[in-house]
Amino acid sequence: MMRFLTSLVLGAALLAGAAQAQNQPLRITIDEGIIEPLPYAAPNFVPDSPAAAEYAAEIARVLAADLTGSGLFREIPSTAYISQVTSFDAPVQFADWKAINAQALITGAVSVSGNRLTVRFRLWDVFAGAELGSGLQFAGTTDGWRRMSHKVADAVYSRITGESGYFDSRVAFVSESGPKDQRRKRLAIMDYDGANVQYLTDSSSIVLAPRFSPTGDRVLYTSYQGGFPRIHILDVGQVQQRVLQSQDGTMSFAPRFSPDGQTVLFSLAQGGNTDLYAMNIASGQSTRLTSAPSIETAPSYAPDGSRIVFESDRSGTPQLYVMSAAGGEATRISFGQGRYGTPVWSPRGDLIAFTKQSKGRFHIGVMRADGSEERLLTASFLDEGPTWSPNGRVIMFTRETQGASGRAALYSVDISGRNLRPVRTPDGGSDPSWSPLQK
């Protein structure tokens, strides 16, 4: 695990351009409206030696990809630069950056000693002609240079939006390869942007629905090893797994951790009925939460652990319901035209994301916990299985193409419905689960 040394003293908020008064802070407010991306420049970081040169260029590249990929920032290409940054401590030529309308400037330096790498950076308010603080430093191994890029991007994002970033995070997903009728599915994990893919299982059995723990060190998933679906739990660091729930004559699936990581919600099918259960991981004891003749599945906790949202067909079609985490009476919250499923609570607690099937199309949507303010963010032949970014501002999901190949791929979209983007994976991908920010 890479160890980070951090020191940060940030000053006044980033200020707007020439047309804005210097005592008014610039802040990107993320809402449902149209956002004009903030123009910024991120020149290659300055290396202290030839050994650091490649890292310096790559760190700036990944940093820019993070910020621009969020849809909130617009990178000014290096071909437009008037000034070049050749020294970390050289005075900034603010007039040159103003001339190309760079409202923010990010400069940095990279040093390498053996397998140790140190990154320093500064965030500048170009139009105010001021440095925002005394600098930030991350240190780790050369193998962890991408994480340091994401850390810098998170710091910039947080400073300008006032909210935490999401770049230094990972995604567990199901890697899919082979023809549609002989699809091989493996559990995999990667950086949020598709880099550093690691396969955690082979393709000897089908795997489904991976779900990260609140600490990001464990993953729940469903495996058909042995012929029946069983819930497994895997330690990501050790790549060690064990069966968490196994009972003859039953099928268990759709697992989800509680916010404290001590309990697992899941669906259990037995005797022709499917209900929700909660298992204490330490003791292995399970408590039945529902007892209806309908199918209850896809449960998800509220961030405070007090309530559960889930999918049920008790009304005749799949709809969304909310109930106490201890079970009891459930309240229906979905009333639009169509079928609803795969609900998941935002880490902010304000929204629930879901899959909706209506009029021959599939959608990813969001609504309030009481079912109000429903909004559909996407529409396609098949969109399903949303998962939230750590800051609750972006949703990743599975999109499957129509046709004989039926290739599944991962996409992301922000909660305003803007910035729909594919997430690159080596093969097809489905069932994403976003981790919390890494420590």
UniProtKB/Swiss-Prot annotation:
Protein name per the record: Tol-Pal system protein TolB
Gene: tolB
Function as written in the Swiss-Prot or TrEMBL entry: Part of the Tol-Pal system, which plays a role in outer membrane invagination during cell division and is important for maintaining outer membrane integrity.
SUBUNIT field: The Tol-Pal system is composed of five core proteins: the inner membrane proteins TolA, TolQ and TolR, the periplasmic protein TolB and the outer membrane protein Pal. They form a network linking the inner and outer membranes and the peptidoglycan layer.
Alphabetized InterPro entries for the sequence: 6-blade_b-propeller_TolB-like, PD40, Tol-Pal_TolB, TolB_N
Family membership noted in the UniProt record: Belongs to the TolB family.
Signal peptide, first to last residue: 1-21
Keyword Heme (UniProt): no
Localization (cell): Periplasm
GO cellular component: periplasmic space
BP terms from Gene Ontology: cell division; protein import
Record SUPFAM superfamilies: TolB, N-terminal domain, Tricorn protease N-terminal domain
UniProt region (Disordered), positions on chain: 420-439
Stored Pfam families: PD40, TolB_N
Keywords recorded for this protein, A-Z: Cell cycle, Cell division, Periplasm, Signal
Cited NCBIfam families: propeller_TolB
